[in-house]
Structure formats: structure tokens, C-alpha cells
């Protein structure tokens, strides 16, 4: 008898899991709220790479996407030229870029020689993954609407705001949840056009998905509905010579035109219906329509973009580095002169790349993606047959949604969005004639090395995050007994330790570097005030005043509380060690803001 090979999960099935599970992870903790979801995405990506390499003996060369190589090269150049990286973000970014490079390379090998069946199976797996993730995510939003999280067996992330509620599912970010639901809307059209979703199931899915978009209060989600409707019209045009099937009306052009109209109509019906129900039952939902009509809806983004542009102008070639956006934003608060929310990203992918990687990084990415797009349009849309065009259009629709979101936020900084983004780029990449082959033994050897290294990284990341997390939530009595992270997230643990330490004139000089590093990690009002006091204690009162004065441009900078704390610190230190001129200035500032300070005056250590 013939021996059967051991059962294994196919790459399309693993792809569905890799899309679905990470965005459904409900656990969010400090110091990195998205760690568990992103770690899950990385684990499943490694599994997908391994499964892809095991499916066949690759016989041709395969390179990762050029834009990934550009970003890796820019990161290495930053390291070689001494660009600051006190936050430790460069190493983590390199690890992510290498993981995505391995995934795209494995996908290209898996699809060599080109196989229509394999390409279609992967696309179907991707569509099902988007749909399942979004449907379950929308259900979690309804759980949150009725405050049922305590009865969900920890499967639903808690929602903790009482007013202007924008329900976020398990992603803890409403715009991200809306993007997942937008991707799923396009997936429903694709699956229905293939006869895999009958009309009643399709309509039910659309109603649930668009209810999730309404509950998220996301303006980006409204745009996604429009993109999905346009895709349905394009799909109808592409299906004009397809004939379709009488038992599946959505495989025909008329059915897809109706789908486009229904996508818009359902949103127009659900928006006022849910709003009216919210007022009737005191759901306290966010008013998306009113926000869309507001004249200043982009003001916060424009302020961030001004900071990003100034970073690019002052660091044009290689940018400020991957983890230094917040630090440079803090440094230039007075120079820009507008009130702004402190952030680690520009909330615009183009400006973010310009600020962080300069002309070399952003320009290289622009060239690489422009060449990629031209090749895709030429080979997939112009020269491709009808089926190839239909498949390419849905993937381009998904990419359009991710890029639209990236113009207003930073979804591609999260693995559960960036990995699918890279996968779609690689899936669309036209096959090129190969000049040389890669021996099977070499591929297997590299695969083993990759699995070992990736396994070590994932295990140590898990261990170190758990250590950083335990320290974050520990009380002071047990804090010093807990181990520090060894390889990853040490900067977060150091910042937490610095913030917990009582400041005195005796330890000021020793603690100042750790506080500055913590501000590099994220400039919070608390660390800014503590650092300013340390500057004053170590003979740099002007620097301390400068740091505190920047709080006036810091959205929610909590000036009153920070001035009050520094003022109390001045009063509690011995006169011989007190920087008197600085303390006199602080006393005057504290008096001016005393009315605001009273609410928080009980806190002695911010």
C-alpha cells in the first residue's frame, strides 16, 4: 500500500487564519497595547512561510519586494551614520521588514511555476479571512454596545468610555475596526461574484458589517463603503461578457450593479436608524455625520503634518529615524507653534516616511512602488485575461482601502495590517523569467535557519514582554523584585522604573539620562515635568523652563497639574539644594493655573 503523507494545513487555510485571528485578540495591556495581536500575526506568518516552503521544491529565484529592501537599507544607513535610536525601534522595525521579506519571498517561491489554481486559492483564503474577521469583529462591537464584555469569557475587549462612544471591537481603535469591515465589504462582493455567497447571505453580511462601521463612528469607514461600491461597479463591468449563473444573480452584471447601490443604501439607512436608537436608549454614540460636517475636522491632522514636514526639512536625507518622531515633535513644539497631539507617527504614510527615512527611504519606496504598479497594470490589467483582471481588481481595491486609511492614520505600523499589505503586493507582482535557479537543498536549509531564528525571536519577545507587562502592573513593594526584560522592550521597563523613582537632589544627575530616554520613547506630560525638575536640580534651570513651556502647545498637556507638581517638589526640597530662581518662576506659573490644578492636587508624584 502507498504511504500517505502526514496531514498538514495548506497555505490558503493558514492564510485565512493569519488574517482572522490577530484582529480578534481581545487582550490589550501596557506597555504595548497591540502586542498580543501583533505577536499572533507574526506567529501565523512564520507558520504560513513554513507551510509554503514545504508544499513544493522551489526551482527558481525569488526576491522580496524591492520597497522592503529599500527600507532595510535606509535603516542600516541610519545606524551607520549614527542616527539616534534611544527607543530601540530600529531593531524591531528591521525584524518586521525581514519577516515581511521572508513572507513575500516564500509566496513567490510557492507560486513558481505560476499556477492559476494556487493563486485563486490564496485569494479566496484571503477573502474568507477578511470576511470572518470583520463579521466576528462587528459582533464584538454589539457586545460592547450593550456592555456585555464581562459575560464574554474575555473574548471581547472592554470598552471604557461613557460618552461619544466609538465602539472598537477587539482592535481598541475604531478606525482600524472600520477598515477591517471595509476590506470585508469588498470581500463579500468578490465572493458573491464567484457564486460563493448567495444574495440573502451577502445582504445579511453587509448589514452586519455596515452596522459595525456606524458603531465605530469612523469617517474612514464611510469612505471604505464608497470604495466597495465602486469596486462592485467595476466588477459588474468586468462581468459583462461572463454570462453568469441564473441561480446566482450576483455573478451577473445587473446583480453587481444592484450590490453597489445596496452598499450605499444600507449605510444611508443604518446611520440615522442607529443614531435614533442611540438617542432613544441612551447609547451615547459618537455622531459621525456631525463630525463629517464640522469645518475643523482635519485640524488635528494638519498640525501633525506640519511637524512631519519640518522634520523632513531639517533631516532631508535619512530622516529622524524610526522611533524618534515623538522626540523631534516635542523638540520643535515652540518652533511650529500650534497645539498638537503628541504622537509617534505622522498620520500620513507619505509624510511619515519622509520624516523618518528622508529622501533616500521615501524616494526609494516611491520609485519601487511606482515600478511595481506599472508592471501590475501592464501585465494584470492590460495584457491579462478576464479572470486575471477580475482577481487583480479586488486585490487593488483592498490595497486602495489600506492606502486611504494610511493617509489619515498609520495602520501599516501594525503587523496585522502590514503583513496582509505586503502579501497583496507580492500576490499581484507579475512573474519574471528567472536567470538562475535555487537548489532545493539550499531553500530547505534557509527555511530551517529562518524557522530557528524566527522561533527564538518570538519566544524571547513573548518572555520579555511578559516581564515588562508584569513590572508595569506591579505595586511598588514587588516592583524591584521582578526581572527586567533581556532583549526586547527593555526601554519600556527602564522608562517605567525611572517614573517610579522618587527624585532627590542626590540622585538627580543619575536619573536624568533615563528620563531623557523615556521622553524619546514617548513624551508624556509626566516625564516632561519630571525631566524639567531634574534639569533644574542639575544646574540647567533654563532647560527645565524650556521643557515646561512647551506644554502650552501639547494637546491635553495638563499644564496645571505639571506646574503644581514641580512647585510642590520645590517646596519639599531643602533650601540649600533648591534652584531658587527656577522655583520662584514655577510658583508664579502654578498660581496662574491654580483653579485647574485643584482637581488633581492630591497627587504627589505624576
Q: Which functions belong to the PLM regions below?
A:
Residues 141, 236-296, 304, 310-314, ...:
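A membrane-periplasm/extracellular boundary helix in multi-pass inner-membrane enzymes
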Residues 2, 12-24, 28, 40-52, ...:
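Alpha-helical transmembrane segments of multi-pass inner-membrane proteins
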Residues 28-31, 83-95, 161-177, 293-299, ...:
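Short aromatic-rich membrane-water interface segments that cap or initiate transmembrane helices
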Residues 30-34, 87-89, 171-175, 217-224, ...:
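Membrane-interface catalytic loops of GT-C/OST-like multi-pass glycosylation enzymes that act
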